[in-house]
Amino acid sequence: MPRSLKKGPFIDAHLFAKVEKAVESNSRKPIKTWSRRSMILPQMVGLTISVHNGRTHVPVIISEQMVGHKLGEFAPTRTYRGHGFDKKAKK
């Protein structure tokens, strides 16, 4: 079930403060965050945010199409190495 419109989008306060500061100072430095649950707001467009995926920080460049999605959607947590293969078929 999606979040109620009257509540508005969720974003962690510490991340919002960093975004406001970066927009105000026109900073190009990536913003490092562990907050995968925060929603992408229109103010973030053009910024680079490094989102933690459990092991490293993945740089995500925010574009117009990402607004309304969560930051965690753009930093995959699992590495897919393909399905198992048959050793006999390889020979």
From Swiss-Prot:
GO CC annotation terms, alphabetical: cytoplasm; small ribosomal subunit
Chain segments annotated as transmembrane: none
Gene Ontology MF term list: rRNA binding; structural constituent of ribosome
Assigned keywords, A-Z: Ribonucleoprotein, Ribosomal protein, RNA-binding, rRNA-binding
Any one of the GO BP annotations: translation
Taxonomic superkingdom: Bacteria
InterPro entries: Ribosomal_uS19, Ribosomal_uS19_bac-type, Ribosomal_uS19_CS, Ribosomal_uS19_SF
PANTHER family: RIBOSOMAL PROTEIN S19P FAMILY MEMBER (PTHR11880), SMALL RIBOSOMAL SUBUNIT PROTEIN US19M (PTHR11880:SF8)
Family, similarity comment: Belongs to the universal ribosomal protein uS19 family.
Function: Protein S19 forms a complex with S13 that binds strongly to the 16S ribosomal RNA.
Protein name: Small ribosomal subunit protein uS19
Species this protein is from: Psychrobacter sp. (strain PRwf-1)
